[in-house]
Amino acid sequence: MSTLCKPSLLFPHYKITQQQMIDHLEQLHDDHPRMALAKRMIQNTQVNERYLVLPIDELAVHTGFTHRSIVYEREARRMSSIAARQAIENAGLTTDDIRMVAVTSCTGFMMPSLTAHLINDLGLRTSTVQLPIAQLGCVAGAAAINRANDFASLSPDNHALIVSLEFSSLCYQPQDTKLHAFISAALFGDAVSACVMRADDKAPGFKIAKTGSYFLPDSEHYIKYDVKDSGFHFTLDKAVMNSIKDVAPMMEELNFETFNQHCAQNDFFIFHTGGRKILDELVLQLDLEPGRVAQSRDSLSEAGNIASVVVFDVLKRQFDSGPANGATGMLAAFGPGFTAEMAVGKWVA
């Protein structure tokens, strides 16, 4: 069984508090008839601060999709290489040991993929398998983990590097006055992670026992982008807030098949921080004590929703807290489709 090793996390230089974001929106849209409601909803997100790749005042002057794409590629190349090198070191491997590189990102576009840059910059083998994942949004991190697990199961030498990169601030549309645009502008943050999945049993971490996927039919409208001249415009249907009740039975089934116990009996959880409501629904539907998702809530509070990077941030927090050897756990994320990706396993100390 393959093992997820300790991730490397990087955050951009600029930081914004939620109060600063509220002040910014009030100044930009001082005559908006629903600003008071937007303010209350933003305060209810449980996000305290986020990191941005550019200062908010610079982002508020939309300089065009071309300029934002240049910033995206520049920072993607720079930050991904730093994170990747640290992750490979964390795993006790060298660049020559990597057989696959997966990259997840839904907040910008590059061709060739960032996987090509990483192969060149890190000096990976020319036979390295590439897996760029661009359209799974927040669930992409967990999807990459599950696909890397599939690859690692083929050979004990099939170590995989997973890089997740999200610059959601580059999708900020300052002139979009819809209520959900205000909320998303105050919810999503920027971050980069890298993590190695070792295909052998020679490292501590989250050893995956079984994975699962679930697609909710007729839910494409829940989470989507409208692609316009100004870039990506994020839209969110309120129905997504009630989606966990449909996914929870599949999570319970996967857990019971693997451990012969309910999710609530697990020792730890690595959950995507879709927002306060999603975490509340996970607690409710899986019959968990609220404190069981504290690390996901901490991630949301300290960095916002960092999309496909979230599961790696929460995984790193697990490493920092040090679960006992043999502790059982579940990793799960949710995103467009509506799609869920899950993995269950045990902690190797």
UniProtKB/Swiss-Prot annotation:
InterPro entries: Chalcone/stilbene_synt_C (IPR012328), Chalcone/stilbene_synt_N (IPR001099), Polyketide_synthase_type-III (IPR011141), Thiolase-like (IPR016039). The active site is at residue 138. It catalyses: 3 malonyl-CoA + 3 H(+) = 1,3,5-trihydroxybenzene + 3 CO2 + 3 CoA. It comes from the Bacteria. Pathway: Antibiotic biosynthesis. One of its GO terms (molecular function) is acyltransferase activity, transferring groups other than amino-acyl groups. The keyword Isomerase does not apply. Its EC number is 2.3.1.253. GO terms for biological process: antibiotic biosynthetic process; polyketide biosynthetic process. Keywords: Acyltransferase, Antibiotic biosynthesis, Transferase. Disruption phenotype: Mutant cannot produce monoacetylphloroglucinol (MAPG) or 2,4-DAPG. Pfam families: Chal_sti_synt_C, Chal_sti_synt_N. Type III polyketide synthase that catalyzes the synthesis of phloroglucinol from three molecules of malonyl-CoA. Required for the synthesis of the polyketide antibiotic 2,4-diacetylphloroglucinol (2,4-DAPG). Belongs to the thiolase-like superfamily. Chalcone/stilbene synthases family. This is Phloroglucinol synthase. It comes from Pseudomonas fluorescens.
